[in-house]
Curated annotation (Swiss-Prot):
Transmembrane segments: none annotated. One of its GO terms (cellular component) is cytoplasm. GO terms for biological process: DNA metabolic process. It is found in: Cytoplasm. SUPFAM superfamilies: Ribonuclease H-like. It comes from the Bacteria. The keyword 4Fe-4S does not apply. It is an enzyme of class 3 (hydrolase). This is Oligoribonuclease. Pfam families: RNase_T. The active site is at 141. Belongs to the oligoribonuclease family.
Length: 193
């Protein structure tokens, strides 16, 4: 037995009602009534968008019939990214991914406090309502949707809109990080006095 007390290391990001929870899903299509989740990723940031704490990223198993039924855009995009093969190889269910993400988020925010953050996040929320209702209910009803600032800058400050270039990787984790970077861009160039 050691005679020195263990050193308590503070978390990189303390639990706070001001933390942001960023989320992105990749889906088989846009209709939650017939399409399904393929991948989900979460990142938690402090209120200043730093530090970033990556949460779990899950490729969610779906049937071959569902994957084969995707339209050409989804087959091409998710085929090129390697996501289709990850989904086929995965054994993770939507319920298992949901539970693991809830356990991760509970370390950083209280239930019902954090807005859901991302790009066109309303679409992700629609899928969560259907396939991960406990996770959707963990969030506050408000959203921080970066696409709102994108649309406003396109109309009010086209040079700000044009100066942010997206990589368009269409993987959940890459898209989450890109959304955070895009909000930081608009914060610096659009939301200025």
């Amino acid at each position: 037995m050691s005679d020195t007390a263990p050193v308590s290391v503070p978390p990189v990001l303390p639990k706070s009602d001001l933390n942001f929870v960023w989320l992105d899903c990749e889906m088989t299509g846009l209709d939650p009534e017939k399409d399904r989740l393929l991948e989900i990723a979460v990142v938690v940031t402090g209120p200043e968008l730093e530090p970033r704490v990556e949460g779990p990223v899950f490729a969610i198993h779906q049937s071959d019939a569902l994957l084969d039924g995707m339209d050409a855009w989804n087959k091409g995009t998710h085929g090129r990214s390697g996501l289709i093969e990850k989904v086929r190889a995965s054994t993770v269910t939507e319920a298992e991914a949901e539970q693991a993400i809830l356990e991760f988020l509970a370390r950083y925010v209280r239930k019902g406090v954090a807005p859901m953050c991302g790009n066109s996040i309303g679409q992700d929320r629609r899928f969560l309502v259907r396939y991960m209702p406990k996770l959707e209910a963990f969030f506050h009803y408000r959203n921080v949707d970066v696409s709102t600032l994108k649309e406003l800058s396109r109309r009010w400050k086209p040079e700000v809109y044009a100066s942010f270039k997206k990589a368009q990787k269409h993987t959940a984790l890459a898209d989450v990080h890109e959304s955070i970077e895009e909000l930081a861009h608009y914060r610096k160039h659009l939301l200025v006095p």
